[in-house]
């Protein structure tokens, strides 16, 4: 029986309607359809148009119906077209025509027989069309609907493949799909469209376009995919509805994906696949899996959700989005991406065979579950580096962002203003040549930023990095860390920690480091620190603004402030022990205990304008250290304390001590103090050895006045014009040169005790 359809514009309803009449009786039925569906049936101009078509009605039957002729076909409401032969199809069409089928609401095509198929359709030019408003069902390996040579499926009803696919031990892929395209095609679903099966849509080859506004629900025991693109495929996937896959073989091993692009038999994918999501994509394993191809583009729009994982499954490695290969892949997330797993779980993963590309996040990317290696964004790569731009939020139990450039040219992370990355380690670098720019927040329970590699560049500009360690370099050389104005690094232990290597730390004016134990800690290697901002250590015991441990060397240049606020034993603005460290200070160093504490072989240059203040401003606790002071050194008890031998102090600035300006402790030998023009000393100069054998000596050079009492030194040698106005001067030297006037005039206004004095010719005492 034939039926004639008219598509007309109904002004009262504001929509197109389909009217039909039986060719034999003239009776008419009205079926309303959306304008978008009407457009699919008829190419329309801007104004409403009227078209007529006559369809051949396929009657209810239990044998295969073979299409013939060019007239469109319809399965009417109430009709069921099926086959009682399990391996055959209910409707078949060869390649003599492009077939056009309409399945009305309430109509059924296919059966529940094992391995049955609803439609097996070839096509003359690839223009075969199936519009389903009813139910299409099957259980065949080659799909409920098989499109052999292109074509389109429009689904406003229900399409299902009821087969149960068990785990194939030989990993042979199966095609238990609702729609199976051998050579490209398209699938379009309205909000009412439902597609269910082990897989939803499988594209074997060619160009395909999938637009889902309804539901694709794939539920198999293993290898279940919402949309699968295979060998040589390319095209687009647009989802405004829901794509869900769940699959488990019962042993904890699962392999399912909402979107899966890959290749079979090592065939190359000839093109690219783009994914555009503003709906929901969900999977137990990998939600969007792009495994073979190049130049992929994925957009998750505002309101879009891509999520992976299942808390009821143990030992699962879940990933919301994984791109294993591809050059210059682009991922943009404005919505929500999340993954749950107990091992190696990722929000977005760029695999080892990717090169270049950009990840842009303005939404949220989250992983939970606490598995080792978890990351919101994990980038490998083996070619050009990948760029990650974040102005949204990223959070994870392990890593927020992990950049692995062991095989690539180095990646780039731009954490922009207003953004936030949080995890046990907010950002981790493994490899060389990576670039990190932070204007937002990086918050780590352990590390805000972890670096393992060489020649990485880190710049924080107006942002904040925090953690137990703000920034930690576990190994590597040539790394450059710069904190610009407005930046803040906060830590419950150490602001910047460097384990080894030769690296550079620069903090500019307006930046701040606030930490409990160490503002900056250098454990070994030749590392340089330039501070123009503020460094503050707040701990109550053994806290340091900058600490160089044994084996560490380098140069500290301070034009800013370095402060400790606790009153614990051993606190110091700068603490250097081990290798040779040169300290150049023209800023401010302030501590309640020690300003600068050094052990052996270090150099302190307190330049003009430089200020060092503490209970003991400068402590030499070792040998062969050098102090040159042109600024101000002020100690509540001692300005400078020397405990060691072979140290030199050269002063043309100000040294103040509540008790001693300069104190040489007992057992310290062969130390030399030189006071030059411009010297201001307040407090005593004391050598606790009080022994000539200690051989600690004072040299007066240039001109000036010294009002300090002097006691215990081996000798005083004057080479210039000096006035000693202190109350006493007691020297321990046993020769006539205990007091030696080599040139100029030396005036003594106090009492002197010495074994002898030498006044050279032409000089005055």
Task: Annotate each language-model stretch with its function.
Residues 661-670, 686-759:
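Extracellular repeat-rich scaffold modules on cell surfaces
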Residues 43-61, 718, 727:
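Extended, small-residue-rich solenoid/repeat segments and analogous flexible loops
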Residues 62-68, 86-95, 114-123, 141-148, ...:
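Glycine-rich beta-solenoid repeat tracts in large extracellular/virion proteins
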Residues 8-51:
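Gram-negative bacterial Sec-dependent N-terminal signal peptides
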Residues 52-58, 71-88, 102-116, 128-143, ...:
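Beta-strand-rich solenoid/repeat architectures in extracellular/passenger domains
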Residues 1-6:
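Short acidic, Pro/Gly- and aromatic-enriched capping/linker segments at domain boundaries
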């Amino acid at each position: 029986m034939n039926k004639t359809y008219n598509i007309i514009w109904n002004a009262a309803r504001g929509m197109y309607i389909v009217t039909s009449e039986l060719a034999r009786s003239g009776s008419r039925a009205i079926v309303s359809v959306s304008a978008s569906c009407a457009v699919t049936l008829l190419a329309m101009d801007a104004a409403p148009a009227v078209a007529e078509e006559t369809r051949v009605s396929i009657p209810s039957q239990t044998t295969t119906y073979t299409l013939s002729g060019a007239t469109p076909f319809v399965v009417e409401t109430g009709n069921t077209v099926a086959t009682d032969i399990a391996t055959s199809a209910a409707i078949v069409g060869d390649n003599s025509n492009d077939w056009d089928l309409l399945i009305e609401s309430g109509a059924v095509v296919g059966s529940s027989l094992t391995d049955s198929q609803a439609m097996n359709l070839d096509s003359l030019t690839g223009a075969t069309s199936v519009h389903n408003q009813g139910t299409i069902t099957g259980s065949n390996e080659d799909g409920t609907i098989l499109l052999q040579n292109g074509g389109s499926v429009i689904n406003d009803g229900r399409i299902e493949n009821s087969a149960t696919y068990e785990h194939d031990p030989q990993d042979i892929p199966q095609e238990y799909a609702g729609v199976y395209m051998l050579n490209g095609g398209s699938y379009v679903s309205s909000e009412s469209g439902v597609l269910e099966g082990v897989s939803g849509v499988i594209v074997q080859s060619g160009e395909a376009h999938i637009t889902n506004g309804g539901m694709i629900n794939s539920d198999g025991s293993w290898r279940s995919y919402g949309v699968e693109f295979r060998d040589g495929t390319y095209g687009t996937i647009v989802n405004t509805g829901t794509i869900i896959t769940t699959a488990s073989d019962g042993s904890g091993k699962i392999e399912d994906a909402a979107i899966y692009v890959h290749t079979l038999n090592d065939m190359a994918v000839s093109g690219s696949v783009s994914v555009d999501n503003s709906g929901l994509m969900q999977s137990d394993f990998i939600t969007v899996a792009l495994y073979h191809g190049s130049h992929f583009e994925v957009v998750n729009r505002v309101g879009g959700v891509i999520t992976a994982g299942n808390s009821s499954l143990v030992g699962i490695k879940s990933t919301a989005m994984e791109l294993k290969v591809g050059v210059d892949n682009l991922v943009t997330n404005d919505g929500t991406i999340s993954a749950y797993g107990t091992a190696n779980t990722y929000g977005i993963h760029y695999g080892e065979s990717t090169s270049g590309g950009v990840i842009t996040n303005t939404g949220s990317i989250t992983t939970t579950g606490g598995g080792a290696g978890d990351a919101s964004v994990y980038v490998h790569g083996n070619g050009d580096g990948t760029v990650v731009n974040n102005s949204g939020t990223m959070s994870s139990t392990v890593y927020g962002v992990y950049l692995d450039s062991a095989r690539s040219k180095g990646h780039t992370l731009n954490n922009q203003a207003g953004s936030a990355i949080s995890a046990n380690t907010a950002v981790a670098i493994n490899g060389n040549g990576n670039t990190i720019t932070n204007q937002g927040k990086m918050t780590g329970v352990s590390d805000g930023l972890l670096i393992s590699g060489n020649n990485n560049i880190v710049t924080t500009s107006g942002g904040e990095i925090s953690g137990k360690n703000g920034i930690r370099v576990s190994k590597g050389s040539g790394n450059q860390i710069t904190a610009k104005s407005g930046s803040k690094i906060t830590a419950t232990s150490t602001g910047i920690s460097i384990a080894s290597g030769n690296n550079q730390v620069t903090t500019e004016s307006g930046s701040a480091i606030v930490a409990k134990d160490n503002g900056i800690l250098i454990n070994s290697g030749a590392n340089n620190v330039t501070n123009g901002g503020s460094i503050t250590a707040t701990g109550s015991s053994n806290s340091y603004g900058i600490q160089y441990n044994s084996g560490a060397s380098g140069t500290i240049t301070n034009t800013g402030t370095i402060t400790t606020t606790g009153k614990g034993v051993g606190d110091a603005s700068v603490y250097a022990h081990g290798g040779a460290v040169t300290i150049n200070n023209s800023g401010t160093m302030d501590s309640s205990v020690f300003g600068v504490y050094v052990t052996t072989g270090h150099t302190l240059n307190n330049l003009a304008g430089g200020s060092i203040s503490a209970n003991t401003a400068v402590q030499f606790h070792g040998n062969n250290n050098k102090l040159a002071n042109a600024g101000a050194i002020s100690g509540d008890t001692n300005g400078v304390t020397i405990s060691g031998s072979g140290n030199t102090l050269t002063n043309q600035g100000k040294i103040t001590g509540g008790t001693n300006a300069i104190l040489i402790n007992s057992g310290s030998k062969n130390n030399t103090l030189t006071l030059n023009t411009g010297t201001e000393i307040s407090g005593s100069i004391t050598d606790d050895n009080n022994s000539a054998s200690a051989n600690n000596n004072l040299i007066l050079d240039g001109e000036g006045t010294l009002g300090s009492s002097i006691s215990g030194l081996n000798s005083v040698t004057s080479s210039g014009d000096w006035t000693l106005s202190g109350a006493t001067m007691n020297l321990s030297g046993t020769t006539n040169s205990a007091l030696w006037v080599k040139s100029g005039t030396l005036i003594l206004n106090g009492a002197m005790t010495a074994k002898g004095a030498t006044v050279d010719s032409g000089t005055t005492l």
